């Protein structure tokens, strides 16, 4: 559990769910953190500010096996992105290995499994890591910065991924020489300290 590792080293933690019943159960489960925890409904398919959330006010969002259930994943990611400060992080737990047939067999009978209206998810509401990376880059994120997955996809087809909310400033800080933000036009000299490596050579050409 995240809170077991955080202890009280955080200012506030907002627990969200579309169901009020789940929020009530969560309040009982996390009763020891009542001074720092807030419980509010959140529908990722709606704009965050229309639900009483302040935009760009969160340092991190943790989404556990939920984004893929949206009718439109791109819009859901944009809604979550609006919650994050520039430079904030989104942590995703999602089913990314699409090979195990047992998952489709077990979940295929549930209406929510077919909630998506996207054409590329006709047979299963899951995306590969490459698809997640591309979609995240299109919706205001850096793409998948890191992915942790089991070596045996059949045994554990889930991945934990981290991506960063980016704007021009954050993109510049992440990759100064590749950012769309231009350097000072009056800069006459640029010193690159990196030794005689291939990466340094690529930067200087």
List the predicted regions and their residue ranges.
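4′-phosphopantetheine-dependent carrier domains
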Residues: 1-205
């Amino acid at each position: 559990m995240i809170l077991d590792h955080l202890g009280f080293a955080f200012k506030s933690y907002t627990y969200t769910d579309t169901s009020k019943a789940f929020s009530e159960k969560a309040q009982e489960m996390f009763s020891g953190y009542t001074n720092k925890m807030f419980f509010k409904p959140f529908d990722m398919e709606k704009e965050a500010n229309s639900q009483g959330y302040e935009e760009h006010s969160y340092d991190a969002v943790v989404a556990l096996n939920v984004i893929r259930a949206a009718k439109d994943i791109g819009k859901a990611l944009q809604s979550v992105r609006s919650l994050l400060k520039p430079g904030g992080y989104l942590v995703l737990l999602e089913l990314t290995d699409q090979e195990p047939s047992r998952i489709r067999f077990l979940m295929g009978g549930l209406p929510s499994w077919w909630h998506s209206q996207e054409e590329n998810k006709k047979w299963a509401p899951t995306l590969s890591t490459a698809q997640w990376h591309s979609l995240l880059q299109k919706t205001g994120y850096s793409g998948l910065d890191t992915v942790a997955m089991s070596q045996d996809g059949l045994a554990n087809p889930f991945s934990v991924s981290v991506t960063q909310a980016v704007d021009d400033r954050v993109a510049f800080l992440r990759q100064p020489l590749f950012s769309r933000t231009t350097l000072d036009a009056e800069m006459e000299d640029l010193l690159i300290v990196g030794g005689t490596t291939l990466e340094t050579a690529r930067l200087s050409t």
